[in-house]
């Protein structure tokens, strides 16, 4: 009886006790940190609470931890972006650049984190509210169809820098243990989409519309016309926007 009693006590306190949530460590993976470009970290040692036989562990702890990590990363990214006062004409946002030995299989980390944050927000809704908040169920469509993909310097070859000059984008960056390729995450208007003849949802009786690819500046290793190699801000495709002009009366 004594052994049975001790076993029951140990089991009881074992179920009541939950392992503490360890802090998520962010470690840079497979890319070189260089001026203006942040390395992409991974959520590595994320150990959640141990789930007991009675299901005493709450999933909100894990969600709160992920939200905390996401907010820290997004806040850190805001510090990387220059102030609007010093940069009204160019967006220096450089999370679209990655140095890697192979083609990245997923979008940049911050893109995934924003999607996951939206998923966490939706997870807190009731099933009915979640269905009504789904853009597909509300009939929401993008004004312009766009595509995003990773491209290499071999695809770009040349680019325009901030001074308006044409520079050669170097395909490989030398590092201590070899070389890494430069990859750029570009977004542009989809030439095979349904909006190549004009923006979606625009009244053609009163407006002329066109989907256009816009560019932003990112930092990359380049070579100018004088064979000088260095890190420069170059323009890459980053979005597809709708431009409108009013139709004049005849």
From Swiss-Prot:
Q: Does the keyword Secreted apply?
A: yes
Record keyword Disulfide bond present? yes
A GO BP entry is: modulation of chemical synaptic transmission
**Residues making up the signal peptide according to the UniProt record:** 1-18
GO terms, molecular function: growth factor activity; nerve growth factor receptor binding
Q: How is this protein organized at the quaternary level? A: Monomers and homodimers. Binds to NTRK2/TRKB. Can form heterodimers with other neurotrophin family members, such as NTF3 and NTF4 (in vitro), but the physiological relevance of this is not clear. BDNF precursor form: interacts with the heterodimer formed by NGFR and SORCS2. Mature BDNF has much lower affinity for the heterodimer formed by NGFR and SORCS2.
**What InterPro entries does its record include?**
Brain-der_neurotrophic_factor, Cystine-knot_cytokine, Nerve_growth_factor-like, Nerve_growth_factor-rel, Nerve_growth_factor_CS
Q: How is it modified after translation?
A: Mature BDNF is produced by proteolytic removal of the propeptide, catalyzed by a FURIN family member. In addition, the precursor form is proteolytically cleaved within the propeptide, but this is not an obligatory intermediate for the production of mature BDNF. Can be converted into mature BDNF by plasmin (PLG).
* Positions of the propeptide removed during maturation: 19-131
Task: Spell out the subcellular localization from the entry.
Answer: Secreted
SUPFAM superfamilies, per the entry: Cystine-knot cytokines
Instruction: Could you list this entry's UniProt keywords, alphabetically sorted.
Output: Cleavage on pair of basic residues, Disulfide bond, Growth factor, Secreted, Signal
For this chain, the annotated S-S bridges are 144-211, 189-240, 199-242
Would you identify the family this protein belongs to, as annotated?
A: Belongs to the NGF-beta family.
What Pfam families does this protein's entry cite? Answer: NGF
| Gene Ontology cellular component annotations, sorted alphabetically | axon; cytoplasm; dendrite; extracellular space; perinuclear region of cytoplasm; synaptic vesicle
Record's function text? Important signaling molecule that activates signaling cascades downstream of NTRK2. During development, promotes the survival and differentiation of selected neuronal populations of the peripheral and central nervous systems. Participates in axonal growth, pathfinding and in the modulation of dendritic growth and morphology. Major regulator of synaptic transmission and plasticity at adult synapses in many regions of the CNS.
Q: What is this protein called?
A: Neurotrophic factor BDNF precursor form
Q: Where does it primarily localize?
A: secreted
The record's section on PROSITE patterns has: NGF_1 (PS00248), NGF_2 (PS50270)
* Record-marked site positions (Cleavage): 57-58
């Amino acid at each position: 009886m004594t052994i049975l009693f001790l076993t029951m006590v140990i089991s009881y306190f074992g179920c009541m006790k939950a392992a503490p949530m360890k802090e998520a460590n962010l470690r840079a993976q497979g890319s070189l940190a260089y001026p203006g470009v942040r390395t992409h970290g991974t959520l590595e040692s994320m150990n959640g609470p141990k789930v007991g036989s009675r299901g005493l562990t709450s999933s909100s702890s894990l969600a709160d931890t992920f939200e905390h990590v996401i907010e820290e990363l997004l806040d850190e990214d805001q510090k990387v972006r220059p102030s609007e006062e010093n940069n009204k004409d160019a967006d220096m946002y450089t999370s679209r650049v990655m140095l890697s030995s192979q083609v990245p299989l997923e979008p940049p980390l911050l893109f995934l984190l924003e999607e996951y944050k939206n998923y966490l927000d939706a997870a807190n809704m009731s099933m009915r509210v979640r269905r009504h908040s789904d853009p597909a169920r509300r009939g929401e469509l993008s004004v312009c169809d766009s595509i995003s993909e990773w491209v290499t310097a071999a695809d770009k070859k040349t680019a325009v820098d901030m001074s308006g000059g044409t520079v050669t984008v170097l395909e490989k960056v030398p590092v201590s243990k070899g070389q890494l390729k430069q990859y750029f995450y570009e977004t542009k208007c989809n030439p095979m989409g349904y909006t190549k003849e004009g923006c979606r949802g625009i009244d053609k009786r009163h407006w002329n519309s066109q989907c256009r690819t816009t560019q932003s500046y990112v930092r990359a290793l380049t070579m100018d016309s004088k064979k000088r190699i260095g890190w420069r801000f170059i323009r890459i495709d980053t979005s597809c926007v709708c431009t409108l002009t009013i139709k004049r009366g005849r």
